[in-house]
């Protein structure tokens, strides 16, 4: 897969008059950009320097994500490293909030209860890492019509609020990203 360079996108958006952008680290992983290599620090600092020159602010970022509740998920160690790297890069860019998806325990007969427990376990070290970088984690509402009759955890506002409320008793850098398109799809 070929993906435009982030630097080209920053320049084109600046020329078009944009001043605020989102940084999508999920695509940076999917399309195997320098983000996934040992050259990631040089790459992100080059983007930071260009964004400053072009007067572009990155207001938020989307972290790499995967279904961490799936015991058979491939490349977990690599993907976990990319989640943390997303936070590191966001911090370098001055991003205050990184958006990430919750996972779903599709194998559980008690999907909501078990998914919540696994999400809490997963997000604790992620939130600690993010706090050390002065970054917040915003868990995003999901949609699941494409996998019906199965369902995903955090497709409802109630599940998402419950998860974030539970995590916020221990962490002050967790919040919600409400994706209106996802919510509209679920109407």
Where are these regions (language model features)?
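Active-site groove signature of glycoside hydrolases
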Residues: 90-111, 133-146
């Amino acid at each position: 897969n070929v993906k435009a360079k982030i630097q080209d996108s920053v320049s084109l958006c600046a020329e078009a008059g944009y001043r605020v952008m989102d940084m999508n680290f999920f695509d940076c992983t999917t399309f195997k950009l320098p983000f996934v290599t040992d050259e990631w620090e040089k790459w992100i600092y080059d983007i930071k320097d260009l964004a400053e020159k072009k007067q572009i602010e990155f207001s938020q970022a989307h972290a790499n994500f995967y279904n961490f509740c799936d015991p058979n998920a491939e490349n977990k160690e690599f993907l976990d490293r990319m989640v943390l790297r997303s936070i590191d890069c966001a911090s370098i860019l001055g991003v205050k909030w990184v958006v990430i998806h919750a996972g779903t325990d599709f194998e559980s007969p008690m999907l909501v209860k078990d998914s919540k427990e696994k999400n809490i376990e997963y997000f604790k070290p992620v939130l600690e890492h993010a706090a050390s970088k002065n970054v917040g984690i915003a868990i995003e509402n999901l949609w699941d019509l494409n996998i019906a009759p199965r369902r995903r955890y955090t497709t409802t506002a109630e599940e998402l609020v419950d998860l974030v409320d539970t995590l916020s008793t221990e962490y002050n850098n967790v919040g919600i990203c409400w994706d209106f398109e996802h919510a509209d799809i679920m109407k």
